[in-house]
Regions:
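Short, charged recognition helix plus adjacent turn
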Residues: 82
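Short, charged/polar connector segments at secondary-structure boundaries
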Residues: 1-78
């Protein structure tokens, strides 16, 4: 079973192809939800040396970044591709 962890946002790399799918309205909606209810769904990241690569959860990551959070909850997964 995977263990939920807090990852430093500054160490999470978002691949260029993922960044093109960013919707600012969705980020705002998720940020509002996080303010009201906390982060409900962890993101998925994989390790890449000293950093982590985002596998799933772009809008949640950007919402936490927008809110000024230093960390985000997620699961570390074993994945070669994203």
């Amino acid at each position: 079973m995977m263990k939920r962890e807090a990852f430093p946002i500054e160490k999470i790399y978002v691949p260029v192809a993922r960044r093109t799918t960013l919707n600012p309205r969705t980020v705002d909606e998720i940020a509002e939800s996080i303010l009201q209810h906390g982060q409900q769904s962890p993101i998925l990241v994989r390790r890449d040396g000293e950093r982590f690569v985002l596998v799933e959860g772009l809008h949640r990551l950007e919402a936490c970044r927008k809110l000024g959070e230093a960390t985000i909850f997620g699961f570390l997964v074993q994945s070669r591709r994203h």
